Amino acid sequence: MKKIIVKSILDHYNLHPVIILDKDLDVKAKYIPEEDKVIIKDIPPEKTNPKDMFITVLHEAKHMLDARNLGISKFLKKYAQAGTVAVYCDKDYHDDNKWEIRAEKWAHKEYNGYWSEDREETKGA
């Protein structure tokens, strides 16, 4: 069921990666541009927060859109450069990477603007 939901979200953006659910994944999700593959942590339904799952998938969708728009090799190069800059500034390669920050902001904006049931209420906030 979760795979169908992920596929439906990604289809909205005309994204069609290989979708893998992995119980042992050490992060919520990750996108592998070279293989056009997204791996989502398979959390049991009773422990899944639907909003968090949506935002996670949207976050990865932004990476896919960036890779498609820039080209995979250029995206990977820019991502690595941003990670190196973060480390040089004594920050975290992943968490402080500008591509991760942009993807997270975009995911929240998309969720509130399109996917959320109460999107009309959040537009004015």
Report residues per predicted region:
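Predominantly extracellular/secreted Zn2+-dependent metalloproteases
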Residues: 18-22
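OB-fold/S1-family RNA-binding modules
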Residues: 29-33
